[in-house]
Regions:
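Non-catalytic terminal extensions of ATP-dependent helicases
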Residues: 1-19, 29-30, 353-558
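Conserved Walker A/P-loop ATP-binding site and its immediately adjacent core
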Residues: 46, 51, 60, 66-85, ...
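Inter-Walker segment of RecA-like/P-loop motor cores
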Residues: 80, 85-120
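SF2 helicase catalytic motif II
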Residues: 114-154
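Interdomain hinge/linker at the junction between the two RecA-like core domains of SF2 helicases
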Residues: 163-204
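Conserved helicase ATPase core of P-loop NTP-dependent helicases/translocases
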Residues: 234-235, 240-263
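Conserved segment of the helicase C-terminal RecA-like domain
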Residues: 286, 291-335
Length: 558
């Protein structure tokens, strides 16, 4: 038996080794390179997006049948660009494509999240191109910049990414660069001792944004500022339903909200008429450890203060709290970087390389071979980088951690069905799409979605949908359900019919009804507890993430 196992294992290793010979770690994977590349580089609030939208409108006006696309990091930002283009060109000419939503997807002018940008067209705008260096989503920017076949590509980003963009787009016939400066001055507010001005919660001025880095911190500050100033305060953070975020942005822009308290989601391209931006902390938990904000991250946030046409200048200062860690020297650097006075770490960071299924051997490989071939691709790419110093300066290989974790869930779901029913495993193509989809590893949509794709069984997915339709009594519960719903909507657009319905399970219109229900429910729910308030006596805790004040904590056993 030992010999048999050894021979089987050796045969399997030989098979994988033969497959790995077809792994091809190419970077530029297009037959038709761009004729023309334009780089619009500069800090936030320097008019880069305005130039890009003007180029889209001009191109469509001249060549109405050609494909023009915009790709950005957020569904909210894509929607903002979509609405602007509709104003200028009319709704018949403009479409929206994100992972969760499609409006008029066959239109000649498209606003998209970067993962949804068509691979071919005539004019492409790539916004926030420094995201190509993001460990999780950077692969999508790198792939579009290196593989998308457009006659003209316009890339927007900070000055530091100029050499990276010129390397990624080096196959273009012509590259021109335009450097922009801020249209509105930005300054650090200083006191008489030349230290950064500090505001207390009771004197936060109107038209301010307060920055903290956790949902509980944001909610606690929102409650305290509203209570002590009497002003209208709203919260903004990543887990909120996108429509709820859009409502806050619109209300702040219209003057219906005086102060917005938000996480670093504001640094991802959200535009608000902010006059004063107050950091409540400069330290965040990034999923692995607590660390100081990098200068480029802080600059993206600080630069949101002072909007062209609405403010004479932007101001940055500090909000005093009992718990926030503030490093004043960093805030000064954020402002200097946001105004182009100093360079940030972006100049030393690298764009993320990630394989395509074609580079692993295509759909002819078996789904069980995917992780082995990804590892071979990774090794070959690292060898290639070692042999190419210029490439090594701008490119690094993705860790592939999230995709491989997703793969394990999908493989387990597939194996359970194969063992139980002797059916065929999930196809390689579906496996690859699903493991790279915007679906959390812990989400039930990943496991049961994979099983649905194998045998069409909708029983568990129906139970999940039923849970989404109940009335919720906390915002946190709604946020969890909304996340599951957006994953289901993404799944439907990837694997359903042209309308985004899942045959035999649910229509697109029903998904949209559930979304409307959750958003309506979200607007009516009042939280029973407020972060930063003791759950026993209602007094202040030392930090928003603590449930009890010190006195109640010390008396918990008495």
């Amino acid at each position: 038996k030992g010999l048999e196992e050894f021979l089987v294992e050796r045969e399997e290793n030989n098979r994988i080794q033969q497959l790995s010979e077809y792994v091809n770690p190419k970077m530029r994977d297009r037959k038709h390179p761009p004729q023309h590349v334009v780089l619009h580089l500069g800090p936030t609030n320097s008019g880069k997006t305005r130039h890009a939208i003007e180029a889209m409108v001009q191109h469509h006006t001249t060549y109405p049948q050609e494909t023009v696309a915009y790709g950005g990091p957020l569904r909210m930002l894509a929607m903002e660009v979509y609405e602007k283009l509709v104003e200028l060109l009319g709704e018949q000419s403009v479409g929206l494509i994100t992972g969760e939503q499609e409006i008029n997807p066959e239109a000649p002018v498209l606003a998209c999240t970067i993962e949804c940008v068509p691979q071919q067209g005539n004019l492409l705008i790539v916004d926030e191109c420094h995201w190509s260096m993001d460990n999780d989503r950077g692969k999508s920017w790198t792939n579009v910049l290196q593989s998308a076949e457009y006659e003209t590509i316009i890339a927007l980003g900070p000055d530091e990414v100029e050499p990276h963009m010129k390397y990624l787009l080096a196959d273009a016939y012509h590259i021109e660069t335009h450097h922009h400066t801020r249209l509105v001055p930005l300054e650090t507010m200083l006191n008489k001792q030349n230290n950064i001005q500090r505001f207390d919660i009771h004197n936060v001025p109107p038209k301010s944004a307060v920055i903290a880095f956790s949902k509980k911190s944001v909610l606690a500050l929102s409650h305290d500022i509203a209570e002590k100033t009497g002003l209208r305060v709203a919260s903004l953070y990543g887990k909120m339903p996108v429509d709820a975020r859009n409502t806050v942005v619109a209300q702040f822009a219209q003057g219906d909200i005086d102060i917005v308290v938000c996480t670093d989601v504001i640094g991802h391209g959200i535009n608000l008429p902010i006059e004063t931006l107050l950091f409540a902390e400069t330290e965040k938990y990034d999923g692995h450890t607590r660390r100081n904000l990098k200068v480029w991250e802080g600059a993206q946030i600080a630069g949101r203060a002072g909007r062209y046409g609405l403010s004479e200048k932007g101001k940055v200062a500090v909000l005093n709290t009992k718990w926030g860690t503030i490093k004043e020297s960093l805030i000064k650097e954020y402002v200097q970087a946001a105004t182009g006075q100093i360079q940030t770490e972006l100049g030393y960071m690298k764009c993320i390389a990630y394989p395509t299924l074609t580079q692993l051997g295509g759909e002819t490989i078996h789904m069980k071979d995917i992780p082995h071939l990804m590892n071979h691709w990774k090794n070959k790419m690292q060898e290639y980088l070692q042999q190419n110093p210029e490439m090594r300066q701008y490119i690094k290989v993705s860790t592939m951690e999230t995709a491989l974790q997703n793969y394990k869930v999908i493989y387990q779901a597939s194996s359970q069905l194969v063992e139980k029913t002797q059916c065929e495993p999930l196809s390689t193509s579906y496996t690859w799409q699903l493991m790279n989809a915007p679906i959390d590893t812990e989400s039930p949509i990943l496991h049961y979605g994979a099983q649905y794709l194998i045998n069409g069984n909708t029983e568990i997915l129906r139970m999940i949908i039923k849970d989404l339709q109940i009335h919720h009594y906390s915002k946190e519960s709604i946020e969890t359900s909304y996340r599951t719903l957006t994953e289901l909507m993404s799944f439907a657009l990837m694997f359903g019919d042209e309308e985004g319905s899942i045959p035999g399970l649910i229509q697109r219109s029903e998904l949209e009804e559930i979304e409307s229900h959750l958003i309506e429910n979200y607007g009516t729910v009042q939280e029973s507890t407020v972060p930063g308030r003791c759950i026993d006596c209602g007094g202040e805790t030392k930090a928003p993430w603590l449930e009890k004040c010190e006195a109640c904590f010390n008396n918990r056993f008495y």
